[in-house]
A protein has these predicted regions:
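Basic, amphipathic alpha-helical bundle interface domains used for macromolecular binding and assembly
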Residues: 74-163
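Canonical AAA+ ATPase core
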Residues: 3-5, 10-101, 150-152
């Protein structure tokens, strides 16, 4: 039921709880964590569902200083004042601007070829892909690669994607 609710939220921006549909307000993003050490006892997402996530970011353990800072900030009664750096409306406007950011055809073609090379049955796939990868990235991979490149360009102050 949890996975079904997660997928409903991701696809339809709503969840159904006890027969009642609850809509999410924009902006709406899903961030999920997966701890491989504790994976036993959970239900891993099938490849088709993993394909719906834009990024899979591997995060290593914190440095001693960073971990000490976390410990100090979370085990005392002092509060940290967080100051917003942007609003939900800012996020919505940025996401719209990403869609309007141009990408030259050779760059889009490069992104598609890169994603296609992740598929073991493709002639362009490297030997290690054929040996170790069961399924490569789907079309969403190409789409998300371009969207991420556009967002990165804007964050770097450029209004076009460059290599």
């Amino acid at each position: 039921k949890t996975q079904a609710a997660l997928l409903e939220a991701m696809e339809e921006r709503q969840v159904t709880v006890a027969g009642e549909v609850r809509l999410f307000h924009l902006p709406f993003y899903v961030f999920a964590t997966q701890n491989p050490i504790e994976l036993e006892g959970t239900y891993p997402l099938p490849e088709a569902q993993l394909d719906r996530f834009m990024f899979n970011i591997l995060i290593d353990y914190l440095s001693e200083e960073d971990e000490l800072q976390v410990v100090n900030q979370t085990t005392t009664n002092t509060s940290i004042e967080l100051k917003p750096v942007f609003t939900g409306d800012d996020m919505i406007q940025f996401a719209r601007l990403v869609r309007y950011t141009p990408v030259a055809e050779p760059i889009a073609r490069y992104a598609v070829r890169l994603v296609q090379a992740s598929r073991p049955h493709q002639p362009e796939a490297f030997d290690f892909i054929r040996q170790w990868v069961s399924w490569g990235a789907g079309t969403r991979g190409s789409q998300n690669l371009i969207l991420a490149a556009k967002a990165r360009a804007l964050l770097q102050g450029r209004f076009h994607v460059a290599l």
